[in-house]
Amino acid sequence: MTADFENIEQLLRDSKPDEAIARLEAYLATPVASCLDVAYYLLGNAYRQKSDWRKAINNYNRAVQLNPDGPAKTALQTAKEILDFFNHDLYNP
């Protein structure tokens, strides 16, 4: 994992999802971005912190498509379980 991702993880630990989102979106806009699965996973985490479940799940799905065995797989399942438990009427898989 690059130093940039470590800085973004620190922003998330510091409850600064908006700054993390801005950095990740700028990173993903670069034409030579690598480690895309990690970037989408972290972006999903940032949106989860903001309780934007739709964007969190969309980004976890992108990460899983790129790396089916990465940490986004568990995060995606957890997000779906949380929504199913707390917002059963709003979430219908």
List the predicted regions and their residue ranges.
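"A position-specific structural signal for the A-helix of alpha-solenoid helical repeats
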Residues: 6, 41-42, 75
